Amino acid sequence: RVLFRSSIFMDKTTQTQIIKLIHQEVIPAIGCTEPVAVALAAAKAAEVLGCKPEKTEVFLSANILKNAMGVGIPGTGMVGLPIAVALGTLIGKSAYGLEVLRDLTPEALAEGKQVIEDKRIHIALKDNVDKLYIEVICSAGDETSRVIICHEHTNVVYVEKNGVVLTDRRKEGVSCDASGDEDELRLSFSTVYEFAMEMPLDEIRFILETADLNRKAAEASLKGNFGHTVSKTVSGVYGRKYMGDSAYTHMLAMTAAACDARMDGAMIPVMSNSGSGNQGIAATLPVLSFAEDIECSEEQLIRALMLSHLMVIYIKQSLGRLSALCGCVVAATGASCGITYLMGGDKVQISYAIKNMIGNITGMICDGAKPSCAMKVSSGVSTAMLSALMAMENKVVTPVEGIIDENVDKSIINLTSIGSKGMEATDKLVLDIMTGKSC
């Protein structure tokens, strides 16, 4: 097998940049991040307006619209964008970021329903914009406000009141250009691996927060019946009878539990990754569950979680925030790296796990955020375990097979190119199907 050259560990500046990047990308979120980001823009627009709007107009990119149509909104028992927008304008606080709706009350929910009934919210598709684009215009009498979020879920790039521009960061290149910031630290497989394996433990211990928060989400899910109850199915009578009771089924059940609750609109915070709560869940809980089953050390858990989360961030750098490719493919690839490491795998075997993942479930489409995402996450976790097992046996999808390259970084670029470029027509067709249904 091809061995990697050893290298001197990275300089302090790069270490600091990576830690900053992780803190930017791994953050708490309540509810699916797309409708929550729309609620955030609505909250900001209402704050700028200075009063409750009489009318709210929302213009969204296709990917935002797709991911917000069928998912539960936390604490409402309702699905979709109108209630997210209404609550954003009524009780949302932009300072809360992706927890913008955490002050929800029954009274506010009732008021939000009335706003919808009065047809004071109008939502439309906006063409030829970034894949992550949210524009909200609020009005009351002669007063108006306008807010644009672009490229990232909390990235407010434009604020206007009564025709006067208060903020316009588009001119600074913060922009709605999906290529992102040219000064952004660009990761590689070796950088990710070396950082996770060699950083002083106390400097990366913070990644345990992902385990604490996402475990609580999984535990809370088991107290009710959320979504399609994928987790309870795996651990139920038939699940135990036909799938058994093992480290494998434990990680399936724990991961699906958090996703079941989140996609059904439970008021449960999770630690997200790269703008996605499901990605944060899938990068965390399979690794945590497996670590607990094999009773590994705290250091091993920290390094496995860091490897998983940073790998997801790396892959998302070239894939982009939103795409036609299901995010669980990316997140489960990170999890497979963490699991392989916990099995005792070395750098080469971890690279094998990545190639095995790419050779298996590349092409799984994203057809919006919804309760059935828990099934897709479970498929990703299942493949993560299989890929790790094969890697430990030094079995890997070879460069003569499909999109796999001898170089692991090139294999990742092949994956993300398919997701960001090759599946654009798929993305459009999926949205056409979703918006054309009678239900």
Predicted features by range, described:
Residues 28-44, 268-285, 326-331:
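Conserved phosphate/anionic-ligand binding catalytic regions in large, soluble enzymes, centered on
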Residues 10-19, 51-64, 246-265, 297-315, ...:
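Acidic-glycine-rich active-site phosphate/pyrophosphate-binding loop
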Residues 29-33, 63-64, 152-154, 159-161, ...:
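A structural signal for small-residue-enriched, beta-sheet-centric alpha/beta enzyme cores
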Residues 46, 290-303, 313-379, 392-402:
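Hydrophobic alpha-helical bundle architecture
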Residues 1-3:
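Short, small-residue-biased leader/transition segments that mark boundaries at the very start
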Residues 117-265, 431-439:
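Signature of multi-pass transmembrane helix bundles
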Residues 39-138:
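Early transmembrane hairpin of solute transport permeases
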Residues 52-56, 96-101, 123-124, 202-208, ...:
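Flexible, glycine/charged-enriched surface loops at secondary-structure junctions
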